[in-house]
C-alpha cells in the first residue's frame, strides 16, 4: 500500500499546466541573482478558487529559496495588510546580523498600523504623529529590508491580495512607484495571487495600474490535466489505464481541484496500489460516487455562503446554461436595473463565488 500522491485542498507539490508562468518567474529570479535590481512591476496571478494560485506562489517561493533569496510570505485579509507586512518582515530579520536587524527593527518599531492609517514615532519616542505619505513609510521599510539581507535579494509573496485593505494596497503601490525612480538597483521583487476581480479591487484603491501585471490562471488543458493525473501515479510505479484516465478527465473537466479529488478517490478505490499495479475503469467508477459527494458539498457550501439576493443573482446567471452571462441579461431576469445589482455582483466576487 502507498499513500495517495494527490492533494485535494492542500498545496500541490508539483504544479501542472503553469509552465510558462513558472518559466517567467524563474527567469526573473535568475536575472535578479546575476544582476541585482528592482523588478519593476508586481506580478499578480489571478483566477477562480481551486485553480492552483497558492500552489503556484509556493512553488515560486521554493524556487527563490533554492537560489538563496530571502522570502517573505503574506496572506491578506486577516487584519490590516501593513500589519501582516510588518510581522512578516520582523520574522524574516530575526536571523540577520545584529546591525542589519536593528536597522530594520528601528523602522518597524516606528510603524504602528491603525484602522485609519499609519502613525510612527521617532527615535526620541515622542508622541505619535500622522505620516503625510504612507507610501513613503512603506518604501522606507521595504528598502531597509532589501538592503539588510545578505542573500541575492528579497522576494515578497502576497496571497489573497483581493482581501487586502485599500490603504495597504495604495501604500504598496506608491511605495513601489517611489522605489522604481529612487532605488532601481534594490534587489526586490513581488509575486501575488488573488481572485479574478483582484484588478478591480486594486484599481479602486489606486488610480494607476501600470505597477501591476496580471496573469490569468484558467482550467487546465487536456494535456496538462492528463499529466496532473498520470505523473504523480507514475512516480510511485502505478499506471492509469487509458479508459480510466479518460473517465476521470471527463469528470474533472480540467478543474485542478477536481483533478486532485478524482485522482485521490480513484487511488483509494484501487486500495492504495503498490508499484506495478494499475488504476482501471472500475476503480474510477467506484470513486465517482464519492467524487459526486465532494462536488455536492463543494457547491452547497458556496451556495450557503450567499444571501438570498446573491442566490437569485447566481440562479439568473445559471439560466445561460454555462455561457458567459451579461450583466444586463441577469438584471432583466431578476427584474432589476443593472445599477441595482452592482453591489450584489461585487459581493459575490469578493466571496469567490463568481468571476
Regions found by a protein language model. Name each.
Residues 1-41, 91, 184:
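A short, basic N-terminal segment
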Residues 37-166, 188, 336, 349:
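P-loop NTPase nucleotide-binding core
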Residues 155, 163-206, 214:
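Sensor-1/coupling segment of RecA-like P-loop NTPase cores
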Residues 217-244, 262:
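Conserved small helical "lid"/interfacial subdomain of P-loop NTPases
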Residues 239-251, 325, 329:
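Short conserved motifs of the RecA-like P-loop NTPase core
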Residues 254, 260-338:
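Winged-helix-like regulatory helical subdomains adjacent to P-loop NTPase cores
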Residues 349-355:
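A short, conserved structural fragment
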Amino acid at each position: 500500500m502507498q499513500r495517495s500522491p494527490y492533494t485535494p485542498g492542500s498545496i500541490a507539490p508539483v504544479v501542472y499546466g503553469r509552465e510558462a508562468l513558472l518559466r517567467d518567474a524563474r527567469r526573473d529570479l535568475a536575472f535578479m541573482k546575476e544582476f541585482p535590481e528592482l523588478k519593476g512591476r508586481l506580478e499578480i496571478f489571478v483566477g477562480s478558487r481551486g485553480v492552483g494560485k497558492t500552489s503556484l506562489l509556493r512553488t515560486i517561493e521554493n524556487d527563490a529559496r533554492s537560489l538563496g533569496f530571502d522570502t517573505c510570505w503574506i496572506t491578506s485579509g486577516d487584519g490590516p495588510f501593513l500589519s501582516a507586512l510588518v510581522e512578516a518582515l520582523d520574522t524574516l530579520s530575526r536571523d540577520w546580523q545584529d546591525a542589519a536587524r536593528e536597522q530594520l527593527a528601528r523602522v518597524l518599531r516606528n510603524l504602528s498600523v491603525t484602522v485609519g492609517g499609519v502613525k510612527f514615532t521617532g527615535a526620541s519616542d515622542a508622541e505619535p504623529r500622522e505620516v503625510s505619505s504612507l507610501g513613503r513609510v512603506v518604501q522606507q521599510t521595504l528598502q531597509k529590508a532589501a538592503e539588510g539581507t545578505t542573500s541575492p535579494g528579497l522576494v515578497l509573496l502576497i496571497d489573497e491580495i483581493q482581501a487586502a485593505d485599500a490603504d495597504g494596497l495604495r501604500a504598496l503601490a506608491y511605495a513601489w512607484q517611489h522605489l522604481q525612480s529612487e532605488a532601481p538597483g534594490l534587489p526586490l521583487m513581488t509575486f501575488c495571487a488573488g481572485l479574478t476581480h483582484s484588478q478591480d479591487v486594486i484599481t479602486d484603491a489606486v488610480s494607476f495600474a501600470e505597477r501591476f501585471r496580471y496573469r490569468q490562471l484558467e482550467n487546465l488543458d487536456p494535456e496538462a490535466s492528463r499529466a496532473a493525473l498520470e505523473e504523480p501515479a507514475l512516480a510511485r510505479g502505478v499506471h492509469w489505464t487509458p479508459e480510466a484516465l479518460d473517465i476521470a478527465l471527463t469528470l474533472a473537466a480540467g478543474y485542478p481541484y477536481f483533478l486532485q479529488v478524482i485522482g485521490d478517490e480513484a487511488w483509494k478505490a484501487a486500495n492504495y496500489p503498490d508499484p506495478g499495479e494499475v488504476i482501471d475503469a472500475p476503480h474510477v467508477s467506484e470513486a465517482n460516487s464519492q467524487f459526486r459527494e465532494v462536488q455536492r458539498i463543494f457547491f452547497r457550501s458556496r451556495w450557503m455562503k450567499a444571501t438570498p439576493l446573491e442566490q437569485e443573482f447566481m440562479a439568473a446567471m445559471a439560466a445561460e446554461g454555462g455561457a458567459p452571462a451579461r450583466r444586463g441579461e441577469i438584471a432583466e431576469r431578476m427584474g432589476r436595473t443593472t445599477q441595482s445589482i452592482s453591489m450584489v455582483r461585487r459581493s459575490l466576487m469578493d466571496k469567490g463565488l463568481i468571476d
